[in-house]
């Protein structure tokens, strides 16, 4: 019975890796389409969202099967519950990747070069967030606590990139009002990448829960207020 359960857990890991791969392709194709203003490629990138949604349903069904048929012990139950939470965030990442490609289509006639918008920051955000998504899934599959925490800490880098990009755009709008609409659209693109980073962080936090039984926020509270926890003021969940 346990061997069968372990095989199904391995299948779950493989399905999560496949979902992560679909998201990676959607983001990479989306940023390529954005930079090159390639509408056809953007339309292809949007199609990944359908595959991501289907993969979410596949994983959800597998998790329910594991819960109903295998009667998992506490540790396994945490792992399956975390996977169910993770795929919700992964599906939202797929949505945001599609949103970025839709913005590319919307801005098809815009002149990036004339607007002097710094596309390097956008490309860096795409690289960072893609890395976060892939590593968060790897952390789950390999039960790698340190890698999950690396992903969480990396979110600050994405936030800093977004803040600097936003300030730069505001300055450009003030200098040239004509570029205001395009700057606003590009800010939305940056915001979508920032949200992808947030969802990758959520995934990493669920990885930590699956390993430790504690959510990252609770672990932080325990470090900050060890006395309160010893006195029973912070309860185990």
Regions found by a protein language model. Give the residues of each.
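Cytosolic, long alpha-helical scaffolding segments
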Residues: 1-237
